């Protein structure tokens, strides 16, 4: 199912021995446009540090109860590699994090999220893999915050196309399937969806996303009504409008992630 990122903010994260916090935002990698961490607001439990949860540990999203089951205990999270609340995520931290939970690293492993039908059982075991050779200040330049990228300007072939308002996330693979674009910058404020696959480039310093579409194509695009569920019929019409093949055509349930 596809969820708006902002709609998931505030969802409770229920660990094996109680609530560990609520979803605050998401970190995604800008190469595969896949969520790599949920950032949890742990309240007064773990202060002055970021609580990052890998999608490998996530169970089913319960929309009615607005919570997600986490295959972790509070003790595991408390003993995990710490990251200061003001500190950027470094590759050294990620290596330590993935070693601790004995997870295959997404940056150099053929085993990617989407190949597991349930949270990895290794999340319950502390890893004892070799220490990383990355330097302590090797920041990961490819991790982006959904909060920070919201508001980025969309540049189409013939001018301003609007701005990024939110993201549509697939809760089975945790891939960002669409960016929600608000066109009020230049048109009537209609909201449309744009797939990351249609993005030509991103200027992270200038906060601009360049898309190989025209204003007229966006005008004629099927409108996205905020809060309405997305079905395959709508997605098919959207892809047909832009003459693109649907992402689901070449994906299988056991191999649907980059």
Q: Where are the language model's segments positioned?
A:
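Peripheral interaction segments used for macromolecular assembly
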Residues: 1-258
């Amino acid at each position: 199912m596809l969820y708006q990122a902002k709609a998931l903010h505030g969802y409770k994260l229920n660990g094996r021995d109680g609530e560990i916090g609520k979803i605050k935002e998401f970190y995604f990698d800008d190469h595969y446009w896949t969520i790599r961490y949920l950032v949890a607001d742990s309240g007064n439990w773990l202060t002055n540090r970021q609580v990052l949860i890998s999608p490998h540990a996530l169970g089913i999203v319960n929309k009615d109860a607005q919570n997600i089951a986490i295959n972790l205990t509070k003790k595991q999270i408390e003993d995990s590699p710490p990251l200061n609340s003001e500190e950027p995520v470094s590759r050294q931290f990620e290596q330590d994090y993935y070693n601790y939970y004995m997870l295959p690293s997404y940056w150099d492993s053929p085993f990617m999220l989407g190949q597991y039908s349930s949270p990895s059982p290794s999340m319950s075991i502390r890893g004892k893999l070799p220490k990383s050779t990355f330097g302590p200040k090797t920041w990961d330049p490819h991790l982006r915050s959904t909060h920070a990228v919201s508001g980025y300007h969309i540049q189409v072939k013939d001018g301003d196309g609007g701005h990024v308002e939110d993201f549509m996330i697939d809760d089975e693979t945790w891939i960002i399937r669409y960016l929600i674009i608000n066109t009020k910058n230049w048109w009537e404020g209609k909201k449309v969806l744009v797939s990351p696959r249609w993005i030509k480039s991103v200027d992270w310093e200038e906060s601009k996303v360049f898309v190989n579409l025209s204003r007229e194509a966006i005008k004629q695009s099927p409108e996205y009504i905020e809060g309405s569920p997305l079905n395959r019929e709508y997605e098919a019409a959207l892809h047909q409008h832009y003459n693109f093949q649907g992402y689901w055509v070449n994906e299988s349930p056991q191999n649907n992630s980059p």
